[in-house]
Amino acid sequence: MKDFQDQVAFITGGASGAGFGQAKVFGQAGAKIVVADVRAEAVEKAVAELEGLGITAHGIVLDIMDREAYARAADEVEAVFGQAPTLLSNTAGVNSFGPIEKTTYDDFDWIIGVNLNGVINGMVTFVPRMIASGRPGHIVTVSSLGGFMGSALAGPYSAAKAASINLMEGYRQGLEKYGIGVSVCTPANIKSNIAEASRLRPAKYGTSGYVENEESIASLHSIHQHGLEPEKLAEAIKKGVEDNALYIIPYPEVREGLEKHFQAIIDSVAPMESDPEGARQRVEALMAWGRDRTRVFAEGDKKGA
């Protein structure tokens, strides 16, 4: 996607931080912005600020964990703008830090519910509508650098972000034939209010094994206050969308750590000489299955047409 003029952009977590940064950057490039966020006052304020910049904006209060609410939001977008979004940004996210061995079911349900299930809800809601519209489009999910490696202090978060990276890799393969690009942005620290996320935690997920108080929130703020500015991150995301890049990682300081992490994985792969015949048979079987899968799915599409 090179031209953002009159594109309809639906941005979750769009009222602040990385989401609002994208709202401004894509809006100033000509897109019509839908700010979707769980905080009603923040949505109203964000829309007013965008409109003050001359950006066409519409706000929707949305809990991305609520699938029925997501469907209503999609209907509202089509009613307001006359079409499904052509640019979807899954940006909303939460985090909570604590020893992984003390993680409760509620910790998992809330953190994974927002960071993974919220993304799934966005994809299942909008992808069929985007395909049906026949318009070229793009989807970007804001994951995390933490999705590339596990963390003993952010276990559910890293697991959810890892899954979202994998999910976008799959959707990218599947949506290419429809003219819909897919990218995943994996930030390190962002100058945002994600440290305040625990204040939005629903009561039904209230049993936590982590320490969440004013001191812990202040500690997190000390990290994020030095993070990448949201609009700078948004500019990198915009360029990634323009280039149809799969990965968007505008953090030069993380290269060495990623190289070490993935080199350790590569070094763990058995050498070819350890089982050449078995490797040949497995590859041939996989390729044969791939050809058969393509045929079966093609026949299934014809029957469903």
From Swiss-Prot:
Substrate binds at S144. Pathway: Secondary metabolite metabolism; lignin degradation. InterPro entries: NAD(P)-bd_dom_sf, Sc_DH/Rdtase_CS, SDR_fam. Transmembrane segments: none annotated. It comes from the Bacteria. NAD(+) binds at residues 10-34. Coiled coil: none annotated. Its EC number is 1.-.-.-. GO terms for biological process: lignin catabolic process. The keyword RNA-binding does not apply. One of its GO terms (molecular function) is oxidoreductase activity. Signal peptide: none annotated. The active site is at Y157. It is an enzyme of class 1 (oxidoreductase). Belongs to the short-chain dehydrogenases/reductases (SDR) family. This is C alpha-dehydrogenase. It comes from Sphingobium sp. (strain NBRC 103272 / SYK-6). The gene is ligD.
